[in-house]
Amino acid sequence: MALLIGDGLWSGVIFTALFLLLVDLMHRRKFWRARYPPGPMPLPGLGNLLQVDFEHMPYSLYKFRQRYGDVFSLQMAWKPVVVINGLKAVREVLVNCGEDTADRPPVPIFNHVGFGHNSQGVAFARYGPQWREQRRFCVSTMRDFGVGKKSLEQWVTEEAGHLCDAFTQEAGHPFNPTTLLNKSVCNVISSLIYAHRFDYEDPFFNSLLKMLQESFGEDTGFIAEVLNAVPVLLRIPGLPGKAFPKLTAFMDSLYKMLIEHKTTWDPAQPPRGLTDAFLAEVEKAKGRPESSFNDENLRMVVADMFIAGMVTTSTTLSWALLLMILHPDVQSRVQQEIDDVIGQVRRPEMADQARMPYTNAVIHEVQRFGDIAPVNIPHMTSHDVEVQGFLIPKGTTLIPNLSSVLKDETVWEKPLHFHPEHFLDAQGRFVKHEAFMPFSAGRRACLGEPLARMELFLFFTCLLQRFSFSVPAGQPRPSDQGIFALPVTPTPYELCAVVR
């Protein structure tokens, strides 16, 4: 009897294994085309999951590119992926084929924090009516509240003043500037979303930022990729909360803020910020179940604005200060330009930027060298597309490798070095390269780019107007190698700030 049970068990195992192999074979059969991009041989069921180093993704993609070319394929379990490298191929995908490559692949790991059919936010929303509705709303609302205008510029300048005051308290001894940079940039976003700025010592504010900081990497590592590729695993009770504890806690805190803010909303009064404007649209959308204006989507939109608007800018500023202490000659030249154009008394203004080509070049080179979003947010083809002679089927996930563009050896003189002259012509005038795309390109380019540019210029010039930065005495020279997550952050470092 035991023998029969054993034989039956093994028969079941063998049958299941053969069935899964057959499913895997049939799933991949449609990609067996002569013009499908080449790539490493996938393992049955797993694909290339074990061949990609998710902790060092840019380098892993670089190695594959060296072997398979600018357009190559990967298989993440049963999910087909094509990686696009180099300026020519990336522009072809994002711009020339933009209408057919603007979709997003499903991201099952976000379902446990509120992502759903009518609550897709903006960044990860499927390309269609809901995305268009929310992007249009965010762009117009940001414009209404001063993006590109003097009113928001004053907010940023005032916050830069608070940041400089906080730096003054740290002057004279080594400190890591990252936390203070996070607080200042987050306050700009909070003012835009909630019409409220936090005191730097506010316990809730510090807890919120700590959770967000600790969530970096939770949605970009090997575990996240496996769960996205095999979403049935997310049905295991308690697994999502254990796999993404900090992201879950951050989203819960955002929801708490929204509930508290909603109790103070008066629809009869002009909107105080983006949240009030969204709530007004929710009222208008009642009776339209297909609308993306609902309470669930408000949380997703606010999360997108918070994460994209705060994390990217503060991380870039952290790179900027690191590179200033590593390149004191560049820092001195920026300060000389600040002294010549602005002086030491008045605060910097956006109008100054046109007369400060070197400072502008340095900020752009910080963005290029820092390369904080090397693999971009994945896209997905909504139709068959042809790229560089390869045929990519509908439903394929695309990874535009922005790092391969920002460090393209055919474009940049010194792609792996910090070199502000990349953005200056022979006469010292600022020039912008086609290969400069830290905000991506095409239909899904970052909608917060105008705000980010304003923040980077005003915060950076305010800091270098007030302080000189250096490597602390007795400490080794910090590394300029980043730590891969979303975003890529500098290796932790300390600096000394001396009031000028």
Curated annotation (Swiss-Prot):
Q: Where would you find this protein in the cell?
A: Endoplasmic reticulum membrane; Microsome membrane
Q: What cellular component terms from Gene Ontology apply here?
A: endoplasmic reticulum membrane
> What is a single Pfam family found in this protein's UniProt entry?
p450
Which family does the record assign?
A: Belongs to the cytochrome P450 family.
- Name what cofactor the protein needs: heme
Describe tissue expression: Expressed in liver, but not in kidney, small intestine, and brain.
Gene3D superfamilies, A to Z: Cytochrome P450 (1.10.630.10)
Keyword Transferase listed? no
Q: What does this protein do?
A: Has bufuralol 1'-hydroxylase and debrisoquine 4-hydroxylase activities.
Q: What is its EC number?
A: 1.14.14.-
Organism annotation: Mesocricetus auratus (Golden hamster)
Keyword set includes Endoplasmic reticulum: yes
The name under which this protein is listed is Cytochrome P450 2D27
Q: Name the keywords, alphabetized.
A: Endoplasmic reticulum, Heme, Iron, Membrane, Metal-binding, Microsome, Monooxygenase, Oxidoreductase
Which residues take part in binding heme? Answer: C446
Single GO molecular function: oxidoreductase activity, acting on paired donors, with incorporation or reduction of molecular oxygen, reduced flavin or flavoprotein as one donor, and incorporation of one atom of oxygen
Mind listing the GO biological process terms from this record? arachidonate metabolic process; xenobiotic metabolic process
Q: How does it sit in the membrane?
A: Peripheral membrane protein
